[in-house]
């Protein structure tokens, strides 16, 4: 029996992908499946404005927005504030929770025995190489730090570097955390000799001109653009950049592609991040919100999301098992199986702390 539109449950979601045609298709499919009316609203694209706007909505008890997409930085702040509905009873039950990266959930999504978000999209920090520049240096792959020197010596132009990065003050913590993990240190403990060694190694890359001093003002957009133009032999960048490289027509096994992690020091580990849904405590449509979240957190919903969006879902079992037509999925599976996955080191004042460290 078809329910009339009057009886349909309604839901309003503020979402980072509101303008994305694929996401609109996913929502249309979900509306049919759940027999629900879903309105999607845009959020600001600039990270600081976005955090400020969402913070205001939640703090003011605004009832017009039910679900909001947030990143690691936002959940790290909001989960302490009492604005969010806990989800462990209705959505993120033990069984569902087991399908997500465990250490990540504990570190990012949970607080005081409650779980406050449902991750839907996973970003994994991958090692990307420009195969043309490696080939020119006589290398098949970059296995260790010695290969950086070989690569650097083979580069023809003074504005080309073996390694590229984004060291602008709001971005550098991604790389700091990555290198500290390689050295087995602790980002929150700068008295730890391993932490110090990791930072010293990054400084030595600069001193030995393996990486560019110009990147102190670069965010990911600038780093990606230089990488696309053949200025860098390799970079660390999240899987989310895949679309950018595909659109620029530089992705491929003989061009720019994801590669196994080199052995820098003692550990092979990498950062992961997600986009996740949170439920506004002030929402008057909690039943509808729970149904939507149960679906997106489920194996079926997560698979549907990955197939329509062509991006990696947050459920590890879906990435492992499903026949998802995603470039580079075999390399992503290798990372999930063989390397330690770390949440980035974020604290309650996440945005401020990240910039201060930078």
Model-derived features: where do they sit?
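Conserved N-terminal structural module of periplasmic/extracytoplasmic solute-binding proteins
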Residues: 4-83, 93-97, 141, 263-266, ...
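Long, aromatic- and glycine/proline-rich binding clefts that accommodate carbohydrate-like moieties
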Residues: 5, 256-259, 307-356
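Extracytoplasmic/periplasmic substrate-recognition and gating elements
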Residues: 28, 32-33, 42, 59, ...
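Short helix-initiation/N-cap motifs at beta->coil->alpha
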Residues: 43-53, 73, 145-150, 215-228
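Paired acidic/hydrophobic, glycine-rich loop segments that form the ligand-binding mouth/hinge
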Residues: 66-69, 233-238
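Hinge/lid segment of periplasmic solute-binding proteins
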Residues: 72-126, 149, 157, 175, ...
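Periplasmic solute-binding protein
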Residues: 73-83, 102-141, 166-188, 199, ...
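Glycine-centered hinge/linker elements that transmit conformational signals in sensory
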Residues: 152-156, 188-219, 261
């Amino acid at each position: 029996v078809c329910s009339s539109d009057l009886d349909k449950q309604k839901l309003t979601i503020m979402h980072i992908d509101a303008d994305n045609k694929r996401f609109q298709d996913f929502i249309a499919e979900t509306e049919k499946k759940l027999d629900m009316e879903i309105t999607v609203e845009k959020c600001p694209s600039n990270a600081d404005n976005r955090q400020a706007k969402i913070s205001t909505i939640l703090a003011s008890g605004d009832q017009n927005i039910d679900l909001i997409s947030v990143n690691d930085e936002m959940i790290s702040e909001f989960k302490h504030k009492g604005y969010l509905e806990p989800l462990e009873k209705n959505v993120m039950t033990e069984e569902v929770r087991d399908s997500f990266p465990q250490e990540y959930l504990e570190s990012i999504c949970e607080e005081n025995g409650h779980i406050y978000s449902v991750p839907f999209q996973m970003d994994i920090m991958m090692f990307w190489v420009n195969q043309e520049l490696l080939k020119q240096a006589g290398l098949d792959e970059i296995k260790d730090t010695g290969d950086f020197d070989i690569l650097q010596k083979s580069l023809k132009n003074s504005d080309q570097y073996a390694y590229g990065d984004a060291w602008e003050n709001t971005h550098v913590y991604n790389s700091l955390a990555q290198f500290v993990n390689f050295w087995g240190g602790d980002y929150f403990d700068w008295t730890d000799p391993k932490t110090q060694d990791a930072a010293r190694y990054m400084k030595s890359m600069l001193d030995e001109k393996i990486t560019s001093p110009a990147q102190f003002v670069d965010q990911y957009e600038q780093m990606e653009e230089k990488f696309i133009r053949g200025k860098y032999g390799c970079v660390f960048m999240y899987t989310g950049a895949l679309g950018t490289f595909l659109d620029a027509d530089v992705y491929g096994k003989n061009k720019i592609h994801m590669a196994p992690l080199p052995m820098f020091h003692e550990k092979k580990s990498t950062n992961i991040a997600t986009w996740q849904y949170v439920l506004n405590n002030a929402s008057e449509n909690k039943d509808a919100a729970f149904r939507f979240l149960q679906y997106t957190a489920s194996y079926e919903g997560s698979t549907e999301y990955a197939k329509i969006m062509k991006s990696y879902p947050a459920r590890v079992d879906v990435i492992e098992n499903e026949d998802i037509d995603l470039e580079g999925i075999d390399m992503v599976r290798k990372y999930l199986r063989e390397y330690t996955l770390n949440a980035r080191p974020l604290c309650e004042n996440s945005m401020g702390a990240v910039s201060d460290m930078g």
